[in-house]
A protein has these predicted regions:
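Glycine/Thr-rich phosphate-binding loops that ligate phosphate moieties of nucleotide
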Residues: 1-160
């Protein structure tokens, strides 16, 4: 997958409704679907499209958050953050630097911190090299296609 994320520059758009369409839509789509002009997409192209769909859903949520507050950078952690390609796409689409923590079990760490009573002396996690936004017009075009297709199928996202 990491190599595919570097090599594939024009994957199809994937409407990711696996398990239901999450925030900010919170509704069902009929079926997850790849939007492409042909049925010749490779497994690699479909895998990259799935990763991009995650980035697109994150971006949609970021845009809604930024209606209420300013965000200057993103910090990511956990399993999927191990994918450099995902982090770079998120930086390029959001226009913000992305910093990744060296913590593949961020959810478990967060639960442990809460269970410990939120101690102020909790050990910090080291940051790994980050990702700066780079111009990626095709990615932004696929994002627009993704949003337009979701709005056509589901309507506007739920109100803030």
């Amino acid at each position: 997958l990491p190599v595919w994320l570097q090599q594939i520059t024009d994957p199809p758009v994937f409407l990711n409704s696996v398990g239901g369409l999450g925030s900010p839509w919170w509704r069902q789509l009929p079926e997850p679907v790849f939007l492409s002009g042909d049925n010749q997409t490779s497994q690699a192209e479909r895998a990259v499209a799935v990763v991009e769909s995650i980035v697109f859903l994150l971006q949609c949520n970021l845009e809604r958050i930024m209606r209420q507050t300013t965000i200057n950078q993103l910090r990511v952690s956990g399993g999927l953050s191990r994918l450099d390609g995902l982090c770079q796409k998120l930086a390029s689409l959001s226009g913000m630097p992305v910093t990744r923590h060296d913590d593949s079990e961020a959810s478990a760490r967060g639960v442990a911190w809460l269970a410990a009573g939120r101690p102020t002396d909790w050990p910090a996690v080291d940051d790994l090299p980050g990702f700066l936004p780079i111009p990626d017009i095709p990615l932004k075009n696929r994002y627009r296609h993704f949003i337009e297709a979701l709005q056509t199928q589901t309507g506007e996202p739920d109100a803030d």
